[in-house]
Amino acid sequence: YADKVAAAFPHRLARSSDAPEAAGLYRRILAAQPDASVTVVSVGFLNNLRDLLDSTADAASPLKGEELVKRKVRQWVCMGGKFPDGRFDDGNGEYNVMYDTSGSVRAIHDWPTPVVFTGFEIGARIKTGAGLRSLPEANPVRLAYLHYTGLEPRESWDQTAALFAVRGAGEFWTLSEPGLCLMHQRVPHGYNDWIPHAKGNHRYLVARMPANDLARIIEDLMIAPPRPRHP
């Protein structure tokens, strides 16, 4: 669906290869921000964040990747993993952390700021998307759902990460006890475990609000019209 959405709307890239390299783009953005001001949200594989941690000094900043993250980032919100038990019945882990497991291990184990995980179980219970039928056909979110689900409701994994990043736990969720998300680099697919630890830098979301109530809040945000552009 991503290619179809990209083809339907104007943009400046003639080819995907014209897009800036992710780690370098992260470095330029982070270097321009005040210290301890940035919330990073990930809703996919963690190879780009691994590459950011592995990056070296450049024109954007004299700091190495881990140093730059530690200085500029306040927290990382990661849609990934499954908590507290990271394995499904087949022994595999959650999609975003299990494939590029080396990237997941490096990013999760070595990230130098607090991390909040919104796990598989959080978004799986929240079904959204039906309201997109009311939007104009030229709406990019509607078009993405049209090609991916036929405008049928689906789980809201990524939306929960975005909502927490902007509004916090609020009345939606509670935070787990501090701990460590431990990644296992198993062949062919990795998985995570949760280890409670009083000095741990990781937490995960725990459901609080009824799923149907939270689905209405998220869907209202999904179908809200964009703010008018100022000249």
Model-derived segments and their meaning:
Residues 1-4, 157:
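Short intrinsically disordered, low-complexity coil segments enriched in acidic
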Residues 3-123:
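Active-site histidine-anchored catalytic micro-motif
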Residues 94-231:
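Conformational coupling and interaction surfaces
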